[in-house]
Amino acid sequence: MTLETAFAAYEAVRHRLPPPVAGRPAPERARTLADVASRYDAFLLDAFGVLNIGETAIEGVAERISDLRELGKQVLIVSNAAGFPHAALMEKYARLGYDFAPEDVITSRRTLLANLNGPAGMRWGLMATPATGLRDLEDLDLIYLEEDPAAYADVDGFLMIGSAAWTEARQALLEAALADRPRRVLVGNPDIVAPRETGFSVEPGHFAHRLADRTGVVPEFFGKPFANIYELAMARLDPMPPRDRILMVGDSLHTDILGAQAAGIHSALVAGYGFFASGDPHAAIAKSGIVPDVIVDRP
């Protein structure tokens, strides 16, 4: 998927996303977060496009985080990461050179689990990669969604958390099962795409919006740009700053920036990495009407 098709895909599902704040002034331009650090007490950092691109850390960001902490700032990761257990994610961040307490990493996976409700004994069909294991999910009655149509027919609901092993054939089975018998669909990663070293990967949000378009089943989304993940992040901040002194930092207008507006906090769009690394953020801002407070070249 290209930048243009990814942007168009997000624009096509705006009716399922929170509305932007209208009438915002043009964003300020800054070189790095250091230039605006004095205005904020807490920084919520996206992962892909801010901390890393795929499996590669963005140079200088670990040092920036250290500098912010030395200034007394609270720094959390707020990421639409759902495909890996929390412990595996912590191992990844450590491997990339980042030092975070597990409680300071707020993910869409954690958000889904914190909000999971329904009748006792529900059996869930799971969109995930078996190789990542079921840590964090041990208390749920799960079956992997693979090639057996019976699994899709028999479960009480569906959890979409990882799409690396997902196929068009499995998507067709899921859509057919929902058309035959509508059930709950919970999405642990609303991202449509994520920036990788070689381009964009397709994420669970892509398939969730597709099935909504084709079946009429409205998925329940957990993660940016929806309020649930920001509520979890706010609960971690101690002391809780005024909302205009909290800055969400991300590379995506439709998740990071839109979600920050919905949460009533400020936002900084990273223009030099991630979604807009090879594109024009100003044109996208004008077209979408999603306006960050600040555009930074790099974190």
What are these regions (language model features)?
Residues 49:
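Receiver (REC) domain active-site loop signature in two-component systems and cognate sites
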Residues 1-45, 53-56, 62-73, 84-106, ...:
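Asp-based, Mg2+/Mn2+-dependent phosphohydrolase catalytic module
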Residues 75-78:
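Short glycine-rich or small-residue beta-strand-to-loop segments that form or flank ligand, phosphate
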Residues 81:
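Conserved phosphate/oxyanion-binding catalytic-loop motifs
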